[in-house]
């Protein structure tokens, strides 16, 4: 009985003096791993326009059906996304949208802070994704 008590206390004391594993979150932030998939971002070309040509491949390949694109054309008859919305409440962050894009217009970032107060704030539109 006493031997088991001493063993238990020795294990407790050993762990008591070790460095803590948990981070104090808002003050200390963990750096994501190299292959981490966070919130999506739309890329711009050198002229400042979105690289996206509204081909709908990302929306087609998305298993959660979280992407909605409505194509439009500019005065030079180039297609661009008139509406580009990602519902992060449905997104499973699989990265298939990034792999399917032929123009490398959509990228997964290292941003993982997604806390919002309203469900509508989980809908990221084109302007938000281009930041």
Each language-model region and where it sits:
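Non-ligating segments of multi-cofactor redox enzymes
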Residues: 1-79, 85, 89-90, 96-99, ...
């Amino acid at each position: 009985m006493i031997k088991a008590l001493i063993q238990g206390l020795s294990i407790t004391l050993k762990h008591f003096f070790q460095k803590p594993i948990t981070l104090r979150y808002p003050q200390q932030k963990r750096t994501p791993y190299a292959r981490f998939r966070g919130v999506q971002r739309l890329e711009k070309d050198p002229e400042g326009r979105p690289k996206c040509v509204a081909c709908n491949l990302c929306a087609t390949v998305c298993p959660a059906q979280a992407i909605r694109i409505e194509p439009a054309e500019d005065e030079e008859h180039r297609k661009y996304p008139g509406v580009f919305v990602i519902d992060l409440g449905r997104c499973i962050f699989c990265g298939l949208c990034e792999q399917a894009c032929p123009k490398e217009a959509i990228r997964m970032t290292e941003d993982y802070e997604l806390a919002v107060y309203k469900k509508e704030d989980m809908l990221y539109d084109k302007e938000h994704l281009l930041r």
